[in-house]
């Protein structure tokens, strides 16, 4: 009987010894090796478990997304060579990221080429072909996207919905669209975000260099923007989130664009724009407005009738200098009655163009 007990205990001991340690399995999973993928399907399905992912000359099939929204937290994603996309009329996105502690970058000489001319028809998102949005940086937290070279997006380039996201030294070159029907090629569209920092961007496009529709604690600095619609807040209003606050846009240049500095809010909507600073912005060859602030947008166009539901308060305009084209307006302000207040306005020095005779409800201290 005694020998049976001993044998039983020995057998039990061997089973316990053979059982894997949960902590060791967990740690080994976290330390998975680098992975290189040559197809979008591989990358989208097999990225989990890789601490570093290299995307080597990926050709994304038509109508599919290079989906990197399920990578492990802390993953580094590296673009290598040319990333390209098949043609199909659909809404996209062509690429998407999500996660915590994610780093996205590229190796020297890499390019992410949307080949947007296949979709461009001069209508953008307002009709014609259905065009895919390019990149979703959604549900990213404590992450970095750096050094990407992006070319010829079909429409909007990078859509941001994130918390504490750094976007540094990104080039978005849609200049081919100037003569080939590029439209609505916004570079950075930001919504429902807290802590977005865009530094050193170089943008050539046919729409906003940056458009902040909602969010707080947002910074754009050291940027160079040309060909588009300028540095924009809005349109604000008519969405689930209609609050913009604590935004700094500074130390940047805007050239050969429709507008320089722009804030626009939606007619008869509600929301707020507060504590926004534009400082040290250099303008050159601005075609329509050097500075334009209006509370009258409806269906994508100004109505000429401002409303008061989205007040603009705590605005600082400081050091906006340079030139506008001969037919352009230096400054245009169209506010509702009492809905623009507590503004600081200094160092505005624009040449060329003309002054507006249609400004309304200009707040104390501002000049139109």
Swiss-Prot record:
Localization: Secreted
PbH1 repeats: 162-192, 193-214, 244-265, 273-295, 307-328
PROSITE patterns in UniProt: POLYGALACTURONASE (PS00502)
GO terms (BP aspect): cell wall organization; pectin catabolic process
Location of the active site: 207, 229
UniProt keyword annotations, A-Z: Cell wall biogenesis/degradation, Disulfide bond, Glycoprotein, Glycosidase, Hydrolase, Repeat, Secreted, Signal, Zymogen
Signal peptide: 1-18
EC number from the UniProt entry: 3.2.1.15
GO cellular component assignments: extracellular region
Family annotation (Gene3D superfamilies): Single-stranded right-handed beta-helix, Pectin lyase-like (2.160.20.10)
Pfam name, any one: Glyco_hydro_28
Propeptide residue interval(s): 19-31
S-S pairs: 35-50, 209-225, 335-340, 359-368
Residues bearing glycans: 246
Class in the EC hierarchy, top level: hydrolase
Gene Ontology MF terms in the entry: galacturan 1,4-alpha-galacturonidase activity; polygalacturonase activity
Main localisation: secreted
Enzymatic reactions: (1,4-alpha-D-galacturonosyl)n+m + H2O = (1,4-alpha-D-galacturonosyl)n + (1,4-alpha-D-galacturonosyl)m
Protein's job: Involved in maceration and soft-rotting of plant tissue. Hydrolyzes the 1,4-alpha glycosidic bonds of de-esterified pectate in the smooth region of the plant cell wall.
Record family assignment: Belongs to the glycosyl hydrolase 28 family.
The protein, known as: Probable endopolygalacturonase I
Organism encoding this protein: Aspergillus clavatus (strain ATCC 1007 / CBS 513.65 / DSM 816 / NCTC 3887 / NRRL 1 / QM 1276 / 107)
Gene: pgaI
């Amino acid at each position: 009987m005694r020998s049976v007990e001993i044998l039983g205990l020995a057998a039990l001991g061997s089973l316990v010894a053979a059982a894997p340690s949960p902590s060791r399995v967990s740690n080994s999973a976290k330390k998975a090796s680098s992975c290189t993928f040559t197809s979008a399907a591989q990358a989208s399905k097999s990225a989990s478990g890789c601490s570093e992912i290299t995307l080597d000359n990926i050709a994304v099939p038509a109508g599919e997304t290079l989906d990197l929204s399920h990578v492990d937290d802390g993953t580094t994603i590296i673009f290598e060579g040319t990333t390209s996309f098949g043609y199909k009329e659909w809404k996209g996105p062509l690429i998407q990221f999500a996660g915590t502690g994610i780093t996205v970058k590229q190796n020297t000489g890499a390019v992410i080429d949307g080949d947007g001319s296949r979709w461009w028809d001069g209508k953008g998102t307002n009709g014609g072909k259905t065009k895919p949005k390019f990149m979703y940086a959604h549900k990213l937290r404590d992450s970095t996207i750096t050094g990407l070279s992006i070319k010829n997006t079909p429409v909007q380039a990078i859509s941001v919905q994130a918390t504490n996201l750094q976007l540094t030294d990104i080039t978005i070159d849609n200049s081919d669209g100037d003569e080939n029907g590029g439209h609505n090629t916004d570079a950075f569209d930001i919504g429902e975000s807290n802590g977005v920092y865009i530094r050193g961007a170089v943008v050539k496009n046919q729409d906003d260099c940056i458009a902040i529709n909602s969010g707080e604690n947002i910074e754009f600095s050291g940027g160079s923007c040309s060909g588009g619609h300028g540095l924009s807040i809005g349109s604000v209003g008519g969405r689930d989130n209609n609050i913009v606050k604590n935004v700094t846009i500074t130390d940047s240049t805007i050239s050969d664009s429709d507008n320089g500095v722009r804030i626009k809010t939606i007619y008869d909507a509600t929301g707020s724009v507060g504590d926004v600073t534009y400082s040290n912005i250099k303008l050159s060859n601005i075609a329509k407005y050097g500075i334009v602030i209006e509370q009258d947008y409806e269906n994508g166009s100004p109505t000429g009738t401002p409303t008061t539901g989205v007040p603009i308060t705590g605005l600082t305009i400081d050091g906006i200098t340079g030139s506008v084209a001969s037919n352009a307006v230096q400054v245009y302000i169209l506010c509702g009655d009492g809905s623009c207040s507590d503004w600081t306005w200094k160092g505005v020095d624009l040449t060329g163009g003309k002054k507006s005779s249609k400004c309304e409800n200009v707040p104390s201290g501002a000049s139109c």
